[in-house]
Amino acid sequence: MRFFLDTADPDEARRVRDWGLLDGILLRPEAAEMKGRDARRVLLDLAQVGDGPVIATLAAGDPKAMYKEARELHKHGKNVVLRVPMTRDGLRVVRLLGDEQIATDVGLVFTATQALLAARAGSAYVSPSVGELDDTGQIGMDVVESIVRVYDNYGLETQICVQGIQNPIHVLDAAALGADVATLPFPVLDRLFEHPLTARGVAALRGPLSDGPRRIH
């Protein structure tokens, strides 16, 4: 499983890159705005952090407007992937961009049938949001499981990016189901390192060293 970092902070992306865990980035426009920065400037900065895909979200609108915005955003880097909404017009844009070898990710996906349509349209990625599904009383991972099964049945190459990840259990479940990517915020990724027994073992390893060299009798 690969990790895409859900962030608008280039410093977070660099930290994860230095850990050897940065496979891609998802930039949400609202996240950039919350930091008081222009989303396109942030996109340019993130695209230079690594070679992996950087997913930029298109504003929903008519196909011509989305297509025009997509081509403009793609100029920020060859690794920029354009996220389109799961709508009829969105899938038209997927097809148009695919003809120009511009990769897309279909978002706002909440059923396996929607994911099937995204794959048939030629999207490189599809992003079901488990957190939002869980918040409505559904089990988000059940949808991911269905998508994995459908894609396996037909040999579909669209990669499944599980997003809306809220905790390490979501990461484990997504990995166990065979999803290609976990798209997660920095705090959740950081928590994957932690376990009380690991902390105890690290403390024990530090103990003898902190006492200084011991004299051998």
Where are these regions (language model features)?
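Surface-exposed amphipathic alpha-helices with a cationic face
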Residues: R17, A47, H74, L91-D99, ...
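Active-site-adjacent beta->alpha loops and helix N-cap segments on the catalytic face
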Residues: E33-L46, D62-K68, V84-E100, T111-A119, ...
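C-terminal alpha-helical cap/extension of soluble enzyme domains
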Residues: Y151-H217
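Conserved, mostly hydrophobic/aromatic
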Residues: R28, L82, A118, A174, ...
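Active-site beta->alpha loop and helix N-cap motifs at the rims of alpha/beta catalytic domains
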Residues: M1-R14, W19-L96, V130
